[in-house]
């Protein structure tokens, strides 16, 4: 198999988060443009079925009876021809070799499964028992199903996936446009020191919505393989800087810890991620995830940023210097009022860097105000 035709080997699952990662790796291994996907499509076109285990270890070997050992290089045509035999096929863990063919796979019959067909029931049980992905090709239904540690995914053709992906991309473009609007408003309000919890929650809400739709599109990119290259480029362009912005907003506004309530940046990001779609639509719930009380009245409470987000927009300013500036001055308003001499009192900030920070903040302040009122 040519190196550029082979996707990364999926490996074995390791818990719920591991199963999700294994599913993504497995989808990548069977995506259009890979030799394995080519072989699966040849099986469908030949109107035959197949049962293929994507990996091997002692557990898989103990489950196999009959058939014969091959240990030959994987090719799409070999896979197609060997699937004409009764029985399953076992590939090496890196998908580079066909190890066995024509084998009968005998998983534990006590493993529960909701599948009905013999081939699909076997595939589901084998994947659960051994931890490797298993592909089942149905001759009668003409579909390919991927089983990964209790999860099932039917492989679709690129046209169907692209249709959904393009709809999601159009939604992402609208979300990103709205995000840019509320983020610009927040910047202007920060300069004027007029920010409320509602303003912060609106930006955090939009950032999370953009992140979620981008994650969905990224899944489509994985499934599309080589057919998703253009989609991947569009996605990268649209979400550039979104993830860092999300963390910067939280770092700017997560409340200072008190005796009754304390929340770290990581905790706030986790809480935002854990919100359901319905909860994300409520600004009060978003505010609560950030660490505020979440009452409707609290949304109009005034808050002040620490300055991480605006300082990150200053060119060529290292993160370590940003942290020192925020720690020294304590808030954005004091940073905006600081002179070049004041800035030089911070460790690591010389005259040239102090002038760069001073001029950068001044330009950001002017442009933010102009964008809001002009």
Swiss-Prot record:
Binding site for ATP: 87, 105, 118-122
Cofactor: Mg(2+)
InterPro entries linked to this entry: DisA (IPR050338), DisA_sf (IPR038331), DNA_integrity_DisA_N_sf (IPR036888), DNA_integrity_scan_DisA_link (IPR018906), DNA_integrity_scan_DisA_N (IPR003390), DNA_integrity_scanning_protein (IPR023763), HhH_motif (IPR000445), RuvA_2-like (IPR010994)
Keywords, comma-separated and alphabetical: ATP-binding, DNA damage, DNA repair, DNA-binding, Magnesium, Nucleotide-binding, Nucleotidyltransferase, Transferase
Entry's EC annotation: 2.7.7.85
Reaction(s) catalysed by this chain's protein: 2 ATP = 3',3'-c-di-AMP + 2 diphosphate
Record domain DAC: where: 20-158
Function: Participates in a DNA-damage check-point that is active prior to asymmetric division when DNA is damaged. DisA forms globular foci that rapidly scan along the chromosomes during sporulation, searching for lesions. When a lesion is present, DisA pauses at the lesion site. This triggers a cellular response that culminates in a temporary block in sporulation initiation.
Cited NCBIfam families: PRK13482.1 (NF010009)
Protein name: DNA integrity scanning protein DisA
């Amino acid at each position: 198999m040519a190196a550029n035709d082979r996707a990364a080997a999926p490996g074995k699952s390791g818990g719920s988060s591991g199963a999700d990662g294994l599913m993504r790796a497995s989808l990548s291994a069977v995506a259009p443009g890979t030799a394995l996907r080519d072989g699966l499509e040849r099986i469908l076109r030949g109107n035959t079925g197949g049962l293929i285990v994507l990996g091997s270890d002692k557990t898989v070997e103990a489950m196999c009876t009959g058939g014969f050992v091959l240990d030959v290089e994987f090719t799409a045509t070999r896979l197609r021809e060997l699937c004409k035999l009764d029985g399953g096929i076992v590939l090496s863990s890196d998908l580079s070799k066909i190890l066995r063919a024509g084998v009968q796979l005998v998983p534990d019959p006590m493993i529960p499964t909701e599948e009905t067909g013999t081939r699909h029931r076997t595939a589901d049980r084998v994947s659960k028992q051994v931890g490797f992905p298993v592909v089942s090709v149905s001759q009668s239904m003409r579909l390919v199903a991927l089983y990964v540690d209790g999860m099932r995914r039917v492989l679709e053709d690129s046209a169907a996936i692209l249709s959904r992906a393009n709809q999601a991309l159009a939604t992402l473009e609208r979300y990103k446009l709205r995000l840019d609007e509320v983020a610009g408003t927040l910047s202007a309000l920060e300069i004027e020191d007029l920010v409320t919890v509602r303003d912060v929650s609106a930006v955090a809400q939009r950032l999370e919505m953009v992140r979620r739709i981008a994650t969905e599109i990224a899944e489509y990119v994985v499934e599309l393989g080589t057919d998703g290259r253009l989609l991947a480029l569009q996605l990268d362009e649209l979400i550039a800087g979104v993830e860092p912005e999300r963390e910067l907003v939280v770092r700017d506004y997560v409340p200072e810890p008190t005796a009754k309530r304390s929340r770290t940046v990581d905790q706030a990001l986790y809480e935002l991620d854990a919100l359901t779609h319905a909860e994300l639509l409520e600004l009060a719930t978003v505010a609560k995830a950030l660490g505020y009380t979440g009452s409707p009245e609290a949304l109009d409470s005034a808050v002040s940023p620490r300055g991480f987000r605006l300082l990150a927009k200053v060119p060529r300013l290292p993160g370590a210097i940003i942290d020192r500036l925020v720690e020294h001055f304590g808030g954005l308003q004091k940073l905006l009022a600081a002179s070049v001499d004041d800035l030089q009192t911070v460790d690591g900030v010389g005259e040239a860097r102090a002038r760069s920070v001073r001029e950068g903040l001044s330009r950001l302040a002017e442009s933010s105000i102009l964008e809001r009122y002009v």
